[in-house]
Amino acid sequence: MSEPSRDPRMQFLIDRLLPGTVRRVRVTGFDGEDVLVRLLDAVGEEGETARIPRHEASTRSTAHPAELFEVGQEIEAEEIGRWHEDRLLLSARACENPALRSFLLALEPGDVVAGTVAGVHDFGVFVHLDGEPDGLCTGFIRVPDLTWDRIAHPSEVVETGRRITAEVIIAETRSGQVAISLKALREDPLVRFADQVGRTLTGPIVRVVPFGVFVRLAPEVVGFLHLSELAAGETAESPEQLVGEGESIAVEVTEVDPRRHRVRLSAARRAGAP
């Protein structure tokens, strides 16, 4: 199940990283560490001048692209944009491994894929996707795409060796990676929680930050209570002066925003309060 709407910033990035047209080019020289090329037409005649930035030359580590390419050599490269003066930019690394490129191009955003967790790190999770070329690890899950819940570390959700099913966000030919999402296959819990606005709930404080606290209201649902609400007339410079992590607190749900995945809270009114 896909998310009802994607963050516009993420969609902009996805649009920029979608595979471009592959062009046949001839290496004409080097400008610093960039590779200069000319486009070739169907009969091999040279056309527009283009540039392959150093970081788009190869996935292999070399001191200079001259170790990879020779002047006069013909290669394939993917269009990635335009440089100043409208010069065409290309990526040779996107075409470096034909088997990998074929695998990536067969995947579309929204496809459901399966794989095995290869590594769990504080910045995300690497996944061996079924069908990927031997010797590669193409799947990657960012921390925000693991779960709707707030977590301290990805190991709370997955472990190395676990089989998973996830949704493709984008298969990126330049990095050779497939960005995938576990949480996209699950309904946003805030969709069903939206009818709780105005209700008073009690839950444990799961995180304390300088400007307030996060309170667990239901499985995978956490709301934020600002320090000004928490203090309720008391003088406090930080939440730690008033409450601690794990402490239960009564709050009123004032806003549920599924688009931003945000729940705002206020202090629960005492009986008889105006």
Residue ranges and their predicted role:
Residues 1-274:
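Single-stranded RNA-binding regions, centering on S1/OB-family and related RNA-binding modules
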